[in-house]
Amino acid sequence: MAGTIQNRDSFLDNIAKELGRARKTEGVQRPVWKNNVNLETLKDCSEEELLEVFKKQCENIHTTVIETTKDELKDAIQQMIAENGGGPILVSDDERFEKYGLTSFFREELPSQNVEVNIWDPEEKDENIRFAEKANIGIAFSDYTLAESGTIVVQSRKGQGRSLHFLPTVYFSIIPRETIVPRITQAVRDMNARVEKGEAVASCINFITGPSNSADIEMNLVVGVHGPLKAYYFVV
C-alpha cells in the first residue's frame, strides 16, 4: 500500500537511544521461532473437519449453526425470520446476495408479505443507523470464518457499516464454506497479502464471536448488552 511515512528515523532513533545502543539499519533478520503454534494449529484439517471444529465451538458461544445448500438457503433464512418474529430487517448491500439467489427475496418477496426490509444505502449514513437501531434482524455475509473460535470476520465497506452487525436484536451471518479457515492467522495473512497487492484496507474490521456475552466478577452471564441477543450462522 503506497503512502508517506513521516518522522520514522527520529522515532526509531529515540527508541534505540532508550535501549542504550545505536540504531540497527542493516543485517537485521527475523528470528526463527522454536514453536509456530499459530501456523500449526488445525493446519492439516480438511474443509469438513474444520466445519466440525467450527460447529462444536459454536455450541460454546450460544450460536445456532444451520447447514444448508445454495438452493435451500432462502427457505432456511425465511424459516428463521419467522421463528424470530419477522422484521424489520436490515440487509447489507452485497453482490453475494445476487450470487446466492437472494436479491429478489429481500427486495420483493418479503416486502410483499408485509415484512419490512431495508437495504444498507452508502449514501444515507444517518438513515442506515436508524434502520439498524430499529431492526429486529441484521443479515450479512462473513468475509472470513475462524473455525477455532467460531468467529466471523466482517469488513466495513460502502454496502455495510458497523451498526448493521451490532444494533439489530438478532444477527444472521451467511457463511460460504470457502471462507472457513483454521484460525485468525490465515485470515490476517490473506488480508495482508491483499494490502500488499494494493487493495485498500477496510476502515473497520470486526471479529464477531456469537451473540453479545458479558459477565461480571461473579461470573453471571448477561447476553445482549453490547450486541445482538441471538446469532445464527448459515453455512452454505
Swiss-Prot record:
What's the protein name? Lactate utilization protein C
**Per the record, a Pfam family?**
LUD_dom
Regarding protein family, the annotation reads: Belongs to the LutC/YkgG family.
* Example GO BP: lactate metabolic process
What does the protein in this record do?
Answer: Is involved in L-lactate degradation and allows cells to grow with lactate as the sole carbon source.
Entries under SUPFAM superfamilies matching the protein: NagB/RpiA/CoA transferase-like (SSF100950)
